[in-house]
Amino acid sequence: VTCWQKAVAIEKVGLYIPGGTAPLFSTVLMLAVPARIAGCKEIVLCTPPGKDGKVHPAILFAAETAGVSKIFKAGGIQAIAAMAYGTESVPKVYKIFGPGNQYVTAAKQLVSLKEVAIDMPAGPSEVEVIADESANPAFIAADFLSQAEHGVDSQAMLVTASESIVKPVMQAIREQLDRLPRKEITEK
């Protein structure tokens, strides 16, 4: 008896890239590059268009660079349903990847009961930094702000036994926050 393990790529995958206040081109890369490396034959991407009816150029560039097969201007639960069940234009996929709001997460969980596989139910962005007095306050602040700018439901926590690090971290957050283009969202 000979046993072996064989890795086989999922033939068709769907990537959901949320819209919102910033183009998430890094999410395109984080999802499409592994799909491409794994050998997926068809990579379908759904993302809502902007107010001008167009997909942000950074999303398009990242998708083309990473080898996405098809891009559709569809967002929210409609996009999840289209990829799960297929439409006249959107092909049915075998697994859906990507973040989204609570409605997208619920839609992904629902279709995963019978139709397709999903990556995981993604929740709000969160970060917890465990630091002592040797930590760089500017780095901690940058870690906090990089997650907090994702949305008003994001959370950032500092765990420390050193009171001496707290004030410098708060000061670094204030300084960096003033330079952020998404300050209004981040400070909520």
Regions found by a protein language model. Give the residues of each.
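Conserved small-residue-rich beta-alpha loop and adjacent elements
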Residues: 2-61
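Structured catalytic cores of enzymes that bind and process phosphorylated ligands/cofactors
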Residues: 4-5, 20, 52, 63-66, ...
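Short, well-ordered, mixed-charge alpha-helical segments that flank or form enzyme active sites
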Residues: 5, 22-25, 51-55, 79-82, ...
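Short, solvent-exposed amphipathic alpha-helical segments in soluble enzyme
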Residues: 30-33, 60-62, 88, 111-114, ...
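A structural signal for isolated positions on well-ordered beta-strands in alpha/beta enzyme cores
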Residues: 42-44, 128, 157
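Short, conserved catalytic or adaptor-binding loops enriched in Gly and charged residues
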Residues: 62-65, 119-121, 180-188
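Conserved NAD(P)+-binding/catalytic subdomain of aldehyde/semialdehyde dehydrogenases
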Residues: 67-155
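NAD(P)-dependent aldehyde/semialdehyde dehydrogenase
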Residues: 156-188
